[in-house]
């Protein structure tokens, strides 16, 4: 993602030429916002009276937001864990796949009870709660990384 690299380069320059894994995250702020907007647009326009292309636009925005969020998070994990980045990335992917496997178990009843609009609104609020971790990681990520019992840069 060239735009993410520009954010990273700017923050490295501003930090005296030293990069930090947290500098990969700013693009995720934009991505999580687009993800939430896309899911809300999809949910509230997925009705038979509304032209089919409108919820498709919501899906496209949601997909772009997902990519703009997941790529910086993956780069953050790789930069944070050094030589252990493959294992850490695998752990993140397993978590994503587990969520993807569990969601269909309750999605049908969620949308049947709440309808698409309110069901997607609930999901957007859950995304908002999860998205709050990005600014926390950006601000306190270095202190959080220093809490772990080992330093990957030593190995």
UniProtKB/Swiss-Prot annotation:
Subcellular location: Membrane
Membrane topology designation: Multi-pass membrane protein
GO cellular component entries: membrane
Signal peptide positions (record): none
Membrane-spanning parts: 25-45, 50-70, 91-111, 118-138
Swiss-Prot/TrEMBL keywords: Membrane, Transmembrane, Transmembrane helix, Transport
PANTHER family recorded: MAJOR FACILITATOR SUPERFAMILY, MEMBRANE TRANSPORTER
Protein family according to the UniProt entry: Belongs to the major facilitator superfamily. CAR1 family.
UniProt-recorded name of the protein: Putative uncharacterized transporter C977.04
Native organism: Schizosaccharomyces pombe (strain 972 / ATCC 24843)
